[in-house]
Structures are given as C-alpha cells and as structure tokens.
C-alpha cells in the first residue's frame, strides 16, 4: 500500500532546489512509514524503485506553458532605436513537453505527455496546494514595523479552495497586531474557521524567528460550521466554557441552568 500511495502522489515545481527538497521529503516519508510499520530501516533494494517512482512523479515544469523550464533568464528591457526596432525577432527555442507515468498501465508504468492529461479540461485540478507566502511587506520598515500581508493571502486562499489549512502569526486571534481590526473581527466571527493549534512562543515552531503573539494553525471549511471563535484564549477548556456561556446568553437562559 505504501508503494501505491507513492505512485498516486504527483506534483511539479519550477525551481530545481525546491524540487530536490520535495523528492527527498517524500522518500523520507516512505522510510519513516516502513520504520513505524515494521520497526526497521528500508534497504537499498527497497528504496531504489521508490526513488525511481518519485523521480517520475515529482518533476520540474513551467506550469504556465506545461513544459520543461528553458532556464534562460529574460533579457532586460532596452530602449529600441529606429534601426533595431524593425530587426528580425530572435527565434525562440521550441518547448519540451514534460512526461509523467501512469503506474497502473504496464508493469513499469506507461509514460505520456503531461498536456495529454489536460485534454478535455479547461482548468488544472489539484488535490491540495502547498505554498509559503510572505507574512509581511519587507519593503516597509523593519521586522517589527513592516505591514502584514498574510491576511491578504488568507482571503485569497479561501476564494480558491473550499477547505484551507494555514500556519500564520496568531495576533489576529486576539484582535491585535497590524492587521485591519475589521478583518480581525471578520475572522473571529467566521463560523467556518477553527484553530487547530496555537503556540505562544513562535521560536518553538520557527527557530530563530521572533513572531510576536505566537503562531497558529487554522482550518477553514466552507461546508462545515464550527461556531465563531469569538474571544480566543490559549486554554482550550476556557474556550469551551466561553462558548457555552455565550450560547446560554444568546438563548436567553439563566447561567444557573
């Protein structure tokens, strides 16, 4: 089953260093599963076919053109003169299609061009998307005065996916920080949003990084209603008590009930 799970995992990345990290992490995930399931490390003979699958399933691609990245940087814009503006255009190298394997066809899988998978589809579909957006605008001020931008990415991600999990600074949970107060209140009153994890010491999550107010992992599912966060505290038990008290007040019942 672990091999089938790896065969079913696909992804592409434009930058080569990020691609290498993704491949290594997926291989380590397989090794950790084997250690947890059978209490032993995988052998080279076991890792070799898994590494081959990963090298096919995680590939380098320009997602805009569905092709192998050319690797040539775009030339800087230059001012054209009367004689050069009518010159012959520089020929562009032909794009090279990316190939992926369907491991359910043939004993060693069947390779096919990636764009053929897209035939009949007007948009690219994803099971999940992983990203690392910036937390603040570093062009403005220092690390303590720069304006946060993670709230914009949270709003954008909610428009793209019906279920979204994010790790962000946690100040907005206390209606603090430099995010807009109106946005903070919107998040705290969102019935589809809940806090999965909170750590007040940000360095425990991101070493050597001072994140004022701590770090939170939030989960939003537009198809589920968890009840508004309202007033957030660092103690889950207290959050539960607060929610029960508020429900009593809203229903007009006595707290003694």
Predicted regions and their residues:
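SAM-dependent methyltransferase catalytic region
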Residues: 1-195, 201-205, 214, 221-227, ...
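Flexible, glycine-/basic-rich loop-and-beta segments that form/coincide
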Residues: 205-257
């Amino acid at each position: 089953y672990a091999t089938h799970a790896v065969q079913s995992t696909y992804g592409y990345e434009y930058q080569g260093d990020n691609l290498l990290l993704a491949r290594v992490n997926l291989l380590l995930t397989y090794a950790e599963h084997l250690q947890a399931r059978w209490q032993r490390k995988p052998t080279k003979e076991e890792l070799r076919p898994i590494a081959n699958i990963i090298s096919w399933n995680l590939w380098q691609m320009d997602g805009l053109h569905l092709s192998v990245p050319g690797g040539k940087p775009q030339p800087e814009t230059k001012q054209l003169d009367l004689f050069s503006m009518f010159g012959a255009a520089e020929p562009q190298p032909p794009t090279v299609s990316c190939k992926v394997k369907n491991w359910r066809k043939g004993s060693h899988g069947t390779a096919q061009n990636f764009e053929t998978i897209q035939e009949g589809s007007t948009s690219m579909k994803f099971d999940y998307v992983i990203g690392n957006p910036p937390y603040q605008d570093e062009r403005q001020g220092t690390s303590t005065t720069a304006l946060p931008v993670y709230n914009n990415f949270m709003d954008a991600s909610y428009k793209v996916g019906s279920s979204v999990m994010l790790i962000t600074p946690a100040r907005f949970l206390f209606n603090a920080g430099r995010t807009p107060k109106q946005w903070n209140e919107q998040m705290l009153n969102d019935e589809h949003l809940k806090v999965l994890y909170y750590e007040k010491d940000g360095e425990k999550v991101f070493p050597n990084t001072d994140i004022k107010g701590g770090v939170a992992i939030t989960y939003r599912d537009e198809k589920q209603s968890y009840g508004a966060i309202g007033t957030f505290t660092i103690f889950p038990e207290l959050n539960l008590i607060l929610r029960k008290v508020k429900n009593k007040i809203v229903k007009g019942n006595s707290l003694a009930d």
